[in-house]
Amino acid sequence: MGQKIDPRGFRLAVTRNWSSKWFANSQNFPGMLKEDIDVREFLKAKLKNASVSRITIERPAKSARITIHTARPGVVIGKKGEDIEVLKQELQKRMGVPVHVNIEEVRKPEIDAQIIADGIASQLEKRVMFRRAMKRAMQNAMRLGALGIKIMSSGRLNGIEIARTEWYREGRVPLHTLRADVDYATSEAHTTYGVIGIKVWVYKGDMKPGQVSAEPTQPEKKMRKGGRNAAAN
């Protein structure tokens, strides 16, 4: 079912590519996969304030190439490139092979699902009202060309006693259509009341066979609100 599965894995090899690009035999595969997970967790913790969208890992010929997609490349690189050199040395110690680090700038962070989710989580940790944070993110995404966006928050919202789920949607988010370019991400806000989970779906348009990204057209003006038992598209 399109509503239940991760939209990224559902569209893998159809409209999306792998985030880890390497080959290994059955003996080395588990260790290399665990290493990729550890590297991503390390980078996300290290670059928490750099608005990191995604991290791509390649392993050509006894080396590693890591591409960091970020909305704030200056924070990653640092003054005169000092921070990126320190980061490269730490990654080489962890992976045990020469590491090349590439930085790619995210041109429109307002329609990037991971950056939106992390931004909402950061606001919730600063005690911003969850409805205000969600609606502001939706307005920015639709203004900059997204065709649809859906945001869901779950937990003790605004510190209530019983945890619940609220979601908002503007435009359309077709989860069953494989050619639809749907970006999806999750994040967590660690508040004084507990953990609040955030899920974000961003629909950027339909993609043609072999196309990597699509330019969104004029957005459709429509908003829906749902509660705990609401069914979403």
UniProtKB/Swiss-Prot annotation:
Pfam families noted in UniProt: KH_2, Ribosomal_S3_C
A GO-annotated cellular component: cytosolic small ribosomal subunit
Single GO MF annotation: structural constituent of ribosome
Domain (KH type-2) ranges: 39-107
Keywords, ordered alphabetically: Ribonucleoprotein, Ribosomal protein, RNA-binding, rRNA-binding
Coiled-coil stretches: none
GO biological process: translation
InterPro entries attached to this UniProt entry: KH_dom, KH_dom-like_a/b, KH_dom_type_2, KH_sf_prok-type, Ribosomal_S3_C_sf, Ribosomal_uS3_bac-typ, Ribosomal_uS3_C, Ribosomal_uS3_CS
Presence of the UniProt keyword Ribonucleoprotein in the record: yes
Region (Disordered), start-end ranges: 209-233
Source superkingdom: Bacteria
Function of the molecule: Binds the lower part of the 30S subunit head. Binds mRNA in the 70S ribosome, positioning it for translation.
Family note: Belongs to the universal ribosomal protein uS3 family.
Assembly and binders: Part of the 30S ribosomal subunit. Forms a tight complex with proteins S10 and S14.
Identification of the protein by name: Small ribosomal subunit protein uS3
Species this chain originates from: Laribacter hongkongensis (strain HLHK9)
Gene: rpsC
